[in-house]
């Protein structure tokens, strides 16, 4: 294997900090502190500005005290918490036949992660999920971790500014997130805390309507391109820019080994679509897919540490004819595979028929289920059609079954939806799926943006995030065109962080408003470096500014290259404010 080359170190003007727990003092919750410079007053005196603390997904890679070693993996911060609960055990070996086969294949030695765990954990009594604990009234360390993380130390600055209330549209956003609130939201099924007991490296996070809107980044190799090194680098790159979870959608060579490297080096939850690997195991022949191979794949991936599975269980055989009226048919890869299988075998899919057994497997490892939208609309013409809604209603039925087994559940959504149909989509989901968190791909609000689909989808993502979606799956500018590269991942993640942030502002999250408030203050005071550092992409902000005003002195200037020295409105504001203040004093 080639040597890994990942980007490390803090973003400009930032430093990693850790906040300790109260209920569980051993917790060290990571955050990013953006250092603010002083305001220079008219009389030349300095006024201190509060530093801004923001949510941080980058893991130890931005901690200057951490020595990165991808061959060792990131720290297993949850291992002792899991051990202390006493409800799991170490298996004697891998339960998956395929996992054992890969482990014993000497030809894979050079590709294999060196420290593979050959004795994964499983629940002693069949269930070790955060949903089960929450329903028992238990507050776990993961729940307090999440509460601290969501608050971002906002209490330290809350009295210094006037927060906008926002319009939460039915969401319930408390002034302060408590561990008990986290527990209650999970218990009600309105939020999930994806945390496979075999992924102790993951830093707990939460996905739910009443929390900050999260984003997911898709990575993964294809039969045509990419390597293990490239996919690990993409994963680390995505979390550096703010991906809350990462889905490995690999369909090329060495899927098992690629996933192991990603999980062991990931501080965020990892999701997959197990059906993809199952299809690879039968050499792409849909007709040969069966429950036994799929079941083995679920166990294989659960024992590696995958935190959530996209499973297309809601696509029923009788739904398939509804797609014949569509302009673009079935565009979901998983959906098209299931539809093909159902049509060939003239029966319900093995996934639907064995759904309860799937839930029992997932409960053993605390793998959350993301109920896939195999019938999502692939164009504006097909939005909110009969096929999409029929599947969505089935997903609601499956949600109740998953909850019966204490399996954490989220619902996947579209797709391509014009702006005037987005709110209706959200309302149907909330009712049909009993308030379970919604996880949407965009939606794209137009079909004509090839090369710019990260923008057309972010428009829809910001709206549906405001209306109630809990997590947004990013879309890159390569959507519909090709496999995204490293820079496409960055562009997609930052674009979706913006969409999520816009939704948080609209819903009235105080932490979102504080960052905007401080950015506006820095902008009016011509504190250029603070503006750069508060940006979602500080490096690009610096690059754009310095392209026309590169000298260090220009970072103190009271103008930029857009308006120049004589046409800067903020500079003019300062001048007439000074005059008005002087007149007021003289009177």
UniProtKB/Swiss-Prot annotation:
One of its GO terms (cellular component) is cytosol. Binds 1 [4Fe-4S] cluster per subunit. The cluster is coordinated with 3 cysteines and an exchangeable S-adenosyl-L-methionine. Zn(2+) binds at residues 416, 480. One of its GO terms (molecular function) is carbon-carbon lyase activity. Its cofactor is [4Fe-4S] cluster. Substrate binds at residues 218, 247, 276, 312, 332-334, 373-376, 412, 439. Its EC number is 4.1.99.17. The keyword Zinc applies. GO terms for biological process: thiamine biosynthetic process; thiamine diphosphate biosynthetic process. It catalyses: 5-amino-1-(5-phospho-beta-D-ribosyl)imidazole + S-adenosyl-L-methionine = 4-amino-2-methyl-5-(phosphooxymethyl)pyrimidine + CO + 5'-deoxyadenosine + formate + L-methionine + 3 H(+). InterPro entries: ThiC, ThiC-associated_dom, ThiC/Bza_core_dom, ThiC/BzaA/B. Keywords: 4Fe-4S, Iron, Iron-sulfur, Lyase, Metal-binding, S-adenosyl-L-methionine, Thiamine biosynthesis, Zinc. [4Fe-4S] cluster binds at residues 560, 563, 568. The keyword Ligase does not apply. It holds the Pfam family ThiC-associated. It is an enzyme of class 4 (lyase). Pathway: Cofactor biosynthesis; thiamine diphosphate biosynthesis. Catalyzes the synthesis of the hydroxymethylpyrimidine phosphate (HMP-P) moiety of thiamine from aminoimidazole ribotide (AIR) in a radical S-adenosyl-L-methionine (SAM)-dependent reaction. Belongs to the ThiC family. NCBIfam families: PRK09284.1, PRK13352.1, thiC. This is Phosphomethylpyrimidine synthase. It comes from Porphyromonas gingivalis (strain ATCC 33277 / DSM 20709 / CIP 103683 / JCM 12257 / NCTC 11834 / 2561).
